[in-house]
Structures are given as structure tokens and as C-alpha cells.
């Protein structure tokens, strides 16, 4: 399947699932392809045929944007190494879940979460350790007794009860033994970031007014490989912010406004060479001098809202 077709299929799935989907934008390199939101959830998606093409830098950028939008990063692809991604299986690239298109459909449209995750050595499942312990104790089985039934050591059974995953074969053997389910589904929305440092070491040159904005009482989070150069936060407001010449930001104003609509945020472009205040769609176009002349963050919010 071509990259474009895969992206179109992903967009169709998210629309079928009731999500509003951002426009596709032409920009290289880019940390994400589309953002989907339904008023409650935001999913930032990177669509790429071979998931091994994702670098740590790509993953960090994707994770940073998703977390700062209170959303979830997700990779959708077709292959890993020399094999196709399995339907119903979750792969992980730098802490970010990666799945194929059918798994995306199952989760978001059919409300059927994946059960399997890929790890070095094969495919595995998570089991409920607490449920396993209850079943074992109800049958008055010791750790060793259950280990003999399953063909594993008592120490391994103890690890299962402590939350360690297991092979599909062992999990099915457990369920057959107790005639009860112990396999836990994987919630794609509940992934946790492995990147403990939210910012790159350097501050991008594109945001030279960062210090001035922060002196006004707002927080600025630089963004990389995105249509907007920063997220500006104040109180409950998030502003997707572009910065540069009027010609440069005018080309991005439309997609920034579109993403702000999907994510229920605001949009602003700060122009370095034009002080004429105006709007392009949802995006406030404001001159750099005009922005820095504002006294309070509320003054900016009022300009954006009015």
C-alpha cells in the first residue's frame, strides 16, 4: 500500500470513529501527519509504511507535541523489520505505540482493543496478576502446583501474579485451566511517555521573543518539525503559535487554525515585518511589536477571542 493510500485510510478510520481530523500539510521534515480530536480525546498520528524508519528524534518530537496538547501519540504503519505488522498486535518505538491500519480500525471503530504486544523474542500478552492469584487461591493451588500445570517454574508464576507478561500459549493455557479470562486488553490511549525531559537542549532560533512572552506571564513550549513553532499557555488557554515574516507565516496560518479547531485551542501567527493586525481563518495575525506592547496575557486572549 502506498504511503498516500495508507494515510487516506487512517483519515477515513478516524472520521468513521467520530473524530474531526486536521488537514494534511506539505512540510518536510514533520513530526506528525494528522491530528484527530473528538472533544474528549486528541490523537497525534504519524503514518509511515515502515515503522523502523522512526528515529528517536522523530519519536521525541511526536511525543512532545502530543503530550503538550494533552493528547496521545500513535504510529500507524505496515511493516517492522522484514515482516508485516500483525492485526491486533501492538509494537513499540521509543515508548510510542505502533499499530497497523486494521488494528486502528478495530480499536477506534469497533471498540475492540488489541491484546498482543510485540517484544524481542515474539508476541506476548498482558495478564491480570491479581485475577490469576484469585483463581489460583480459589483452587487451593500453590505457586508450584500451577507452575507444574503450566510447565513453568513457581518463580515464573509469581512474576505473572506481579504483572509480568507471558506468551500467548501460556496465557491460553491459564484460561483453559481455570475456564476464565485473564488476558488484559491494551489501551492505546493510555500510553506513557518514556521521554522524561520535555525539551530539547537548545531553544529554537525561530522563537526569539520567547523570553518577552514569558515575562508577560505566559509559558512558551518550543515545538519542532510542526506547522507552529511554539505552544503558548496561559491559564486554561493554549495558543498554537507561528513566528516569522508575514509571507512565511501566512502560508502556515490556515493549517495552524485548522489544527486549533481540531484540538479546541487558539491560533496565532506573530509577524516580524508587518504590524497590520488581521485574521486568516481562525488564526490571529499580529505584528511582533504589537504583541510585545500588550501589558497582560488577558489582553492577548481578548484579541484572539474577539
Curated annotation (Swiss-Prot):
DNA-binding region: 143-162
Signal sequence, start to end: none
Domain HTH cro/C1-type as annotated: residue spans: 132-189
Matches recorded under SUPFAM superfamilies: lambda repressor-like DNA-binding domains
Pfam families recorded: HTH_3
Keyword rRNA-binding: no
GO molecular function annotations of the record: DNA binding; DNA-binding transcription factor activity
Domain of life: Archaea
Stored SMART domains: HTH_XRE (SM00530)
Keywords: DNA-binding, Transcription, Transcription regulation
Protein name from the UniProt record: Putative HTH-type transcriptional regulatory protein Mhun_2548
